[in-house]
């Protein structure tokens, strides 16, 4: 591992760091290789020199005359000097060649590093979503890889896709004049355009089919065109619309007798183009330069009046809320009806209760005190007594008379007591006979009503029984006293 200082880290982040240790190691290796090659060459040269010397000696031996001339070996020394000089020259050449190779290698490495850096930068420019931090980190990683020798492999280039050639044909458009200026127009509900040529035969059918579109604008405010004949008898296009530009720069659109004001606004920051589409591709016709806005000339114009009428008609048809005019408060009317219903229910219930209630003097409500009312009351009570199976009649008036009669017997003489007792017995017997006859005559008529009235008397049954028992005791006591007097 290489130890990097603060300056090395700063150079790595800036992308200017160069690893010297790796270059030194590579240079040392190359120098060692060169030295080894040089030693081998020197050995070969020495061998060649020795072989030459041997050959020369052999030649000298053969030629004795020559040996005599060269007794001190000057020739050999000269030849050795020449060989050494040649070797030195060769070494200097090889050193120069080695230096040149080293310089070339360094240049190649620098070029490769710069090329890699350029590729990385081009990729970073293409990737718009990368941030500055990512770029700095990538540069640092690249420098580290290059310094340590880890990123020496060349990046694989993406293979180019070879696609089938596309044959483009010009899109045939309508034979119109070339547009000098293309403008954008937004259609409002006061204006319509009919792209099909006008035909008086099919006009009514088309308008009937396009009822929804017809409701948006009037027939008179629709831009139309048709085929006609010019002065030379050739077919030409005719339209009911004219665009007039005045000297002051203002423009008006005439549709028949209708006049509309036009204002042009340039498109500054917007980019709109007109395209002609075809299967597989589209063809650009031109750029939209400006926008047109159309409006009525004034409020009193026919177009504006017709538009307001159509809007009013649509609002009347579409409105679903219905209003009702009334002078009475619905809440009070509702309370009044509820009160009347409650009163009717109370009256009905009251009548029903009165129909089931008996006509008695004791207890419930009664009518006026007439003879018939009193007789009916007695009859009701007598019928109730007959149902109980008791023939004894209880009468409060008779009890009071008996009590008075008893007191008179105590105060008077014995003869008067006998007369009073006989007269009291005779009166009681006569009254009992008369009442029994009346009972027999009325029992037949009252039995039918007794069943319905019996239920109403169930609550008063206990009180009636107590009253009957008390009256029996009083009556019997009086009769027993009379019997004792007779004895």
Curated annotation (Swiss-Prot):
Sequence ranges of Acidic residues compositional bias: 56-81, 98-112, 132-142, 392-431, 457-467
Disordered: region residues: 1-142, 344-487
Pfam families according to UniProt: Leo1
Protein's cellular compartments: Nucleus
Biased composition (Low complexity): 27-36
Single GO MF descriptor: RNA polymerase II C-terminal domain phosphoserine binding
Basic and acidic residues: bias regions: 86-97, 344-357, 382-391, 441-456
GO cellular-component term (any): Cdc73/Paf1 complex
Stretches assigned to coiled coil: 331-357
One GO biological process term: positive regulation of transcription elongation by RNA polymerase II
InterPro entries attached to this UniProt entry: Leo1 (IPR007149)
Keywords on record: Activator, Coiled coil, Nucleus, Transcription, Transcription regulation
Comp. bias regions, Basic residues: 116-128
Nucleus as UniProt keyword: yes
Reported function: The PAF1 complex is a multifunctional complex. May be involved in both initiation and elongation, histone methylation and RNA processing.
Family to which this protein belongs: Belongs to the LEO1 family.
Subunit record text: Component of the PAF1 complex.
Protein name: RNA polymerase-associated protein LEO1
Taxonomic placement: Eukaryota, Amoebozoa, Evosea, Eumycetozoa, Dictyostelia
